[in-house]
C-alpha cells in the first residue's frame, strides 16, 4: 500500500505520516490529472461507502434524539446544525467540545466549519467568527467557545459590537479547562489547576453593548 499526498505544499513527514508519493500543486487540478492517468474506472462498489456513511449518520443522530438535562454534546451539535443553513458558518474555539463538533457536525459547503485543529489555539473561535462575519455579512455566523477559550479573547466583543457584526457567540461553560482535564485523566494524573471562576456572561456581554442570554 502506498500513501499519495496531494496538497498545495509538501507534507510534514513524521513517525506516523510518511507518504511514498507527493503531488504538490493545485489540489483540484492534481486530482483531475490523477483521475485521467488512471484511465479506466476502478471497480469500486459505492454501496459500501454509502453503508459507512449511513452508519456514521445513525450514530450521530441516535444519541442526539434522546433529550437529556444537562444536554448531551451530540444533542447540542444536532440543535445547532438544525439552526444553521447549508452556507452558514460555525467557528470553533479549542476545547473538549470541539471533538464532538468535528465528528458530528455535518458540513455541506466548503469553509463552513472553521477550526484550528493542529495547533489547538485557545481563543481563536471569536476572532475567526468575526472575520467570517466581515467576509460574509449575509450569512449566519456562530462562534462556539468553551469558557476558557472565550475569556482569552473576550475583549473582542467590543470590536464586534463596534463593527456591528452579525454573529452569535455560544459559550459552553463548565468553569474549568475540560480538554486539559481529559488529557490529565488519560495520562493517569489527578485534576490539577483546572478550575476557576467566571464572570456573569450575560452581564459581561451587555457591558460591551452586546445582547446576553
Task: Map each language-model feature to its residues.
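Generic enzyme active-site microenvironment
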Residues: 5, 91, 144-145
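Residues immediately flanking
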Residues: 8, 94, 174
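Active-site diphosphate/adenylate-binding microenvironment
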Residues: 54-138
